[in-house]
Amino acid sequence: MTDNNNLDSLIIDKDEYLNSPMNVVDKLFKFDQNNLNNGTVYKKFENVISEDQIYKSIPLVSTINQCDLNSGKLVKIRCMIQDIFDPQFCPSFNKIKNIETNEIRLEASKYKDKINLNDCEELIFDSFDSSTFDKTILYCIPIPCENKWVNNNNNNNNNNNNNNNNNNNNNNNNGNEQISSSLLNKKKRNIDDADMKNENDEENKKSKDQKSTTTTTTTTSKEGEEEGEEGEQLTKSKKLLTNNKIDINKIFNYPIPIDSNDENNLKTPFIVNIYDDDIIFDENNKAVTFKINEIIEFVGVVAKFNPTLQHQSSNSSDQGETTTTIIDLMSMLDVDEISTIPDTLIPQFHAITYRYLDPYKFNHLNPFSIDTNTTINNNNNNNNNNNNNNNNNNNNNNNNNNNNNNPNNNNPNNNNLNNNLIRNELIKFIKLFIVDELLSEYLLFHLISKVYSFTSGLSIGNFSMNISIPNDKEFQRLPQLIELLYEILLARSYRFSMSLENLNDMDVVPYKDYDRNRIVSGLLQLPKGTNLILDETQLTEGKVESQGIKVLNALNTLSIQQKVEYDFKYHPIEIQTDLPTISISFGKSLIKGTTQISINKSIQLPTINEINQQLIHSYNNDKLNQFRNYINHCKNLSFKISSPTTTTIAESDDATRHIQEDFVKSRQLDSKMTTDVFHYWLTLSRLVALSFNDQYIKIDKWNIMKSLEEKRKLTINNL
């Protein structure tokens, strides 16, 4: 074992940790070979990056271009675990022999994917002196359903961290333009059939052009070299996404189809190599294990992506070696375990340490709360004073103050008066999209809802909604309007068009492909806290096949129980999740929900242009961030059964008695009243209380809930 006192004598500059991390690993290995296996490497790095400013300065990479530009440096990737491969056993170091001098040297093999051999060196394969280790291999994809404002903020933060301040002055000014031009125009095309037709014609034309472009190889593209490395890499990524011979969603195993014309979708998945999987511990001092669908930020080294391979042509032996692009390669490969072809399809990432990200926490500075204070094995992270990182990974009590670093001082936790003001403004903002005031209240509750416990088969806190609309063209754009609203306010959301084709043909339920030994992703493989909009208005007459029936059953199970049964062929694997669902249908919904509401038939929904004008003139980025912070605060506010202070215990006890008496009275008036209804009332009253910044149910909030319910029932009776 390494003597800590001796190790302290090894002085390594902080800049070397950030700019040449592999040099640090090599120095630690040369100092003592045991440093590779006793946790010294990640402990030394944690000592450095536990400083908040240093951690923020580490570049966040997400595209192939960014990976290549930062190759060899310490970088971060933020992603979702889509699959966990079988562990690999590897030697801790390799013996390398100099053929000319017979000198033998040792080289560390951890955190690397290649062996550095000189011309006169060879690898000694029959050496058994090296101790072995098993590394965990994760397949990680870009966080699904992430909305554009999150990507924009991440990019802005990344620019700030890299001292690219020249563009920062335009960030706030471009916020409304981004919403109006990117989100709103997209929705306008979705609603307007004529525009959709024109758009499809343009895309078909682009597709033909891109198809002809992809036939050229990278070796003959001198023009690409003149455009620079960044332009070349973007071209490769776009070729990969738009190639007609392959289904990139299948290759990359994305749960939802991606739009190849959207530059935000140039993000790449990663194969993440984990060398120390006992870094983070729970409150019981047990190592936290990796699970699929979790969002994690890894810190480590990314291997330089190599999109071309040298191979021997099978058709003509006299041609010798030829260079094949990744496009051509993927079109002829039968993709087996993706971990066997990492250099050709997906960049390799060697993780030194990592942070679990809370899927429920976001604000406009950093969309997720990074858990730098989660228990680290050497306890060197506990000095991190970042307010945004004060939450333990497994802490579900939602004691959250990650809005305290908001420079606009829009934290709704300041006082109830400020909170109520923001609440009223947010209701007004929601009404801008859907007009109906009662529906706006229930949408607010849906926005701040989350499952906080699974007990006896119940998902406590689940608040799934059914919205019934008249079979009228006037109301057919409601799903798109709610989609736009959610894209502006939430970090992650997705509208699933429940057309007959999608039900019968689209991968919705993830399943295990035993031939390729991987989980094939589906729509329901999403991180917790992703809001799903189920658009039943797209359903037309036709036959629902067995696959479609399976999809409907899965959506119903998700909506009510918040669980997804992954199809492992011989037996289902039940995965608990939290994907708040909202279904919109003409009349009665095919998807069960915890509540149903009908929109007011007398209202007139706004057009996209009308919303656009309102957003531009009335809502700037600061105001939108205030709404996002309010939702984040309410979603993560610690809720208690009774008052936490002695001064209001009497008030809390009175509320408890009032609730009990009200339920007894309700059962006396209606013999059909069940405990399920009472559970729903408790859930709804809890959301009402949280929306007013109350941490327990008060009598007035219970009465507000009952009043809202009476109005909601009237809308259902009018169906």
Swiss-Prot record:
It comes from Dictyostelium discoideum. The keyword Nucleus applies. Its main location: nucleus. InterPro entries: MCM_complex-bd (IPR019140). Interacts with the MCM complex. Keywords: Cell cycle, Cell division, DNA replication, Mitosis, Nucleus. One of its GO terms (molecular function) is chromatin binding. GO terms for biological process: cell division; DNA-templated DNA replication. Associated component of the MCM complex that acts as a regulator of DNA replication. Binds to the MCM complex during late S phase and may act by promoting the disassembly of the MCM complex from chromatin. The keyword Transferase does not apply. This is Mini-chromosome maintenance complex-binding protein.
